[in-house]
Amino acid sequence: MNPMEEVRIFKVTLNIGVGEGGEKLARAERLLEEMSGQKPVRTHSKVTNPEFGIRKKQPIACKVTLRGERAEKVLKMFLEGIGNRLKASQFDEYGNVSMGIDEHIDIPGMKYDPEIGIFGMNLSVTFEKPGHRINRRRIQRRKVPQKHRVSREEAIEFMKEKFQVKIV
């Protein structure tokens, strides 16, 4: 296979949507830091929603972006927690995959801590092929051609080969 056509993981993003700030959000941040080894960043609400008691620009969630070996390690742990099974509908047209878990204690290696509690979380994996830097660089920025973008089928094949995931 052409080395420029090999699919690779660009980033893994872990997200916990708490829905409120304060102590609960701080506990979610501690959990993400414990899982990933990186300090999470807070995300803020975009609009005011009085039904949920949320004001605009209020911190309501936290996320952490992982790259490299750390991303693969966390992805393997997460996949074991959901039983190494994914639905084909979890892959989008650009080959990205998103999954969620209801309780973080289902992930191997994670223990229940009464100070933190139990949180559910979402994980998104972004795939790319070598050469995608042309889309991000500052000088002579270009679009990635359609034939060089990662397709749904390529991402599914990558997950089957590298992580032995079953597609249901």
UniProtKB/Swiss-Prot annotation:
PROSITE patterns per UniProt: RIBOSOMAL_L5 (PS00358)
Key word Phosphoprotein present: no
Source taxon at top rank: Archaea
UniProt keyword Transferase, yes or no: no
Disulfide bonds: none
GO cellular component, as recorded: ribonucleoprotein complex; ribosome
GO biological process, one term: translation
Keyword field: Ribonucleoprotein, Ribosomal protein, RNA-binding, rRNA-binding, tRNA-binding
A GO term for molecular function: structural constituent of ribosome
Function summary: This is one of the proteins that bind and probably mediate the attachment of the 5S RNA into the large ribosomal subunit, where it forms part of the central protuberance. In the 70S ribosome it contacts protein S13 of the 30S subunit (bridge B1b), connecting the 2 subunits; this bridge is implicated in subunit movement. May contact the P site tRNA; the 5S rRNA and some of its associated proteins might help stabilize positioning of ribosome-bound tRNAs.
Family per record: Belongs to the universal ribosomal protein uL5 family.
Subunit structure: Part of the 50S ribosomal subunit; contacts the 5S rRNA and probably tRNA. Forms a bridge to the 30S subunit in the 70S ribosome.
Name by which UniProt lists this protein: Large ribosomal subunit protein uL5
Species in which this protein is naturally found: Methanothermobacter thermautotrophicus (strain ATCC 29096 / DSM 1053 / JCM 10044 / NBRC 100330 / Delta H) (Methanobacterium thermoautotrophicum)
